[in-house]
């Protein structure tokens, strides 16, 4: 039995099914595209699913909501990991978008592009770029809290969101 969180909540059969479907979608999308990087999307499917379904505070109906938590995929070549979770979380991406992975004009390009795909927080691709963006976002939120909402207690401000980052060894080596 797989357990998560400090309260040791067990994953449901539905959670495990969604994670397994995420893995299958990753393999299928790369096969259809004829290129891509399925490894990270398969190996981290559970982590990304848990972040979007249980850990992160976000609103797919308002992808730019100021108080949302952010997930930065520094390993931009693994964009499929992010796209699959955006489908499952209801950000307006569909399976048909996954079928267009890495195709010209698709909403699912080979690397995440800010402003192109709903739910993508920053453009990544060059190794280390997402990591530095995430640090900057976290520092900006702390600064904005102090400047724009100084009376709010810790955890009580729209600026008290989290910035999560998925990165690989290449990002750390840069």
Language-model segments: residues:
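Cofactor-binding active-site loop characterized by glycine-rich and histidine/acidic residues
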Residues: 43-174
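Short, Lys/Arg-enriched N-terminal segments with co-localized hydrophobic residues
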Residues: 1-3
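N-terminal accessory segments
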Residues: 12-18
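Flexible, glycine/charged-enriched surface loops at secondary-structure junctions
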Residues: 15, 35-41
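A domain-level signal for the structural core that forms small-molecule/cofactor-binding pockets
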Residues: 9
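N-terminal capping segment at the start of a domain
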Residues: 21-35
């Amino acid at each position: 039995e797989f357990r998560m969180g400090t309260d040791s909540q067990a994953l449901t059969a539905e959670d495990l099914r969604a994670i397994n479907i995420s893995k299958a979608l990753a393999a299928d999308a790369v096969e259809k595209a004829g290129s891509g990087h399925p490894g990270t999307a398969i190996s981290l499917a559970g982590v990304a699913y848990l972040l979007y379904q249980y850990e992160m505070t976000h609103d797919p109906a308002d992808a730019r909501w100021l108080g949302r938590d952010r997930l930065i995929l520094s390993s931009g070549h693994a964009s499929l990991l992010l796209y699959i979770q955006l489908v499952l979380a209801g950000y307006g991406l569909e399976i048909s978008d996954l079928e267009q992975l890495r195709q010209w004009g698709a909403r699912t390009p080979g690397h995440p592009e800010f402003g192109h795909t709903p739910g993508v927080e920053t453009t990544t691709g060059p190794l280390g770029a997402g990591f530095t963006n995430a640090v900057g976002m976290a520092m900006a939120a702390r600064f904005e809290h102090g400047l724009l909402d100084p009376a709010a207690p810790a955890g009580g401000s729209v600026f008290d969101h989290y910035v999560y980052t998925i990165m690989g060894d290449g990002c750390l080596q840069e």
